[in-house]
Amino acid sequence: MEIWINPACSKCRSAVQLLDAEGADYTVRRYLEDVPSEDEIRQVLDRLGLEPWDITRTQEAEAKELGVKEWARDASARDQWIKALAEHPKLIQRPIITADDGTAVVGRTDEAVRDALSR
């Protein structure tokens, strides 16, 4: 199990605290420092069962500068979104937990973190 976090994020800190409280075996990836490649983002999207626009923080200043709210949300624009996430990792929703069964969740609630633990 791996968790992608931004240590400044309260939801990330809460998720890590819950994983620790449950005695989970996991690794931490500080994705703003250890930036995921486009291929890694594609892999995590497959595991999440989501599209890149589903995990994009559209309210971030960088998202507004890029104009992502105006981008198409279909197969033709998928690579554009993934490239933006790789080049601007601050736009990636967090925390993302990759579960041992090959799936992943966006762990913004205790329930989502527990769901990842149960997989």
Swiss-Prot record:
Gene3D superfamilies: Glutaredoxin (3.40.30.10)
Xref: InterPro entries: Arsenate_reductase (IPR006659), Arsenate_reductase-like (IPR006660), Thioredoxin-like_sf (IPR036249)
Keywords of the record: Disulfide bond, Oxidoreductase, Redox-active center
CDD domains on file: ArsC_ArsC
Protein's UniProt keywords contain Oxidoreductase: yes
Coiled-coil segments: none
Pfam families: ArsC (PF03960)
Ribonucleoprotein in keyword set: no
GO molecular function: arsenate reductase (glutaredoxin) activity
Entry-linked PROSITE patterns: ARSC
Origin: domain of life: Bacteria
Paired cysteines (S-S): 9-12
Family: Belongs to the ArsC family.
Protein name, entry field: Uncharacterized protein in glnII region
